[in-house]
Amino acid sequence: MSSTHTKTYLGNLDPSAPKETQHPCIYFSAVEQWERMKLYAAVLDFEPVAQEFGVERGFDPHIHDEAASSVDRYAQEREDLLHMPFVTIDPVGSRDLDQAVLIEEIDSGFRVHYAIADVAAFVEPGSELEKISLHRGQTIYLPDSPARLHPEELSEDAASLLEGQTRPAVVWSIDLDERGEVTATKVRRGLVKSRARLDYDQAQIDAENGRLHPSISLLPKVGQLRQESALRREAVNLSIPSQRVVKVPNDDAGEHYEIVIEPRPHIMDYNSEISLLTGMVAGEMMVKAGHGLLRTLAPATKESEATFRSEAQALGFEIAPEQPIGEFLQSVDPNTPKGMAIQREAQKLLRGSGYASVKNGDSEVHSGVGGYYAHVTAPLRRLIDRFATEHCLAIASGTDVPEWVTRVEEQVLDTMKYSSILASQVDNACLDLTEATVLKYWEGQNFNAVVVASEPEKNSARLFVYKPPVLAKCIGAPEQGTNQEVTLVTANLKKREVLFAWPAD
């Protein structure tokens, strides 16, 4: 097999390499999406992907004008909560801040206060802002720049829970006992002010050095309790590290790209547990009331679970037949190449998620969290959160759900279905393009890989390549679970396709 480069054997990725040897990268602003992997690749151009899938990244001028002039529709209904020292925790540089948190210790356990951006306060029913959000459904996060659900005047300013700014919010207060189980819930509209804008990396360092911000000093403890709670132990909760693409100079004065795994701080998972907790409380609330909007996911089939266990063993993990997959995943370090690979494989167990209206008590659970669940914590980037939240507020106050909610609920569900499919397609296309771009420089080279699955009858296999950390197709069917040397046959940017061959040249 011909190659313009000297043949090089690429071995295991060394995650312990010192940071000073890693190359800088321009980050794009992203927010936590616990069901998806984050890809930081601002050094690449994803506009062709956006055009192919019809993703609109901008807004017409009149939409910007409407967003800039919008005011709080519920100003007279708010409880003054400005005395509460909320803080936000997000990726570095983020300005679309949906959530702020404060955790207190009480006699019976803990009280979790969670302030959520009140987007409904700024979106007038029947307005152009409502129409565009009903069309888009959710923010689509391309790695170079996002296609936002709302204009920046809202998502990064008036509705965002920015540090030091008085903001309208929907505030949840959830009491937990000493085991982390829910004992009481309160939700209302309020005015809040974030005291600090924290990022995950610095918060993790602070936690490890005993100087975590007082407002979240209990977050690690509460997060761990929630992970260990009865419903959560057997749930399939993914902890996928992000990946970033860096530009690396060649010896011949050219350059190529590499993928680096971004270590996932524990504080990120603990923070995600607060969002999951709130969504589970909201789901239970709506099911008991007999109305609302749920996030649903049917349990994985026995066949898909068996396939996952086989792939885990092929990657070198030990998983006993009786061990719940959720419990196994909690034991895996996602910041290693194999750990990231098995977390990505576990995504297949969460296929088929959707949204449903609660009707006549006939409600589906979300097997990914282990109970009823609703999306209510990310209204800046997801349409349905705005509407599900109104159900919860109505239930809590004993009032009717607003007509502007019930009038368009079916459209909201349809838009979420369509936009979720679109977001998944764009995610996959961006990842495929990234992997093809990174590997293009190494066409014809040999790589070390482990065989995740093998189909001799089709003369094909699925591989996990150690460096760069990619899952890819292979011509040839080496034995599952074995380490093999394979040759990169194709890295096609136009087709966004990567293909290896075995045996290696």
Per-region residue spans from a language model:
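Electropositive polyanion-binding surfaces
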Residues: 2-42, 46-52, 62-482, 491-499, ...
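Residue-level recognition of conserved beta-strand edge/terminus positions
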Residues: 487-489
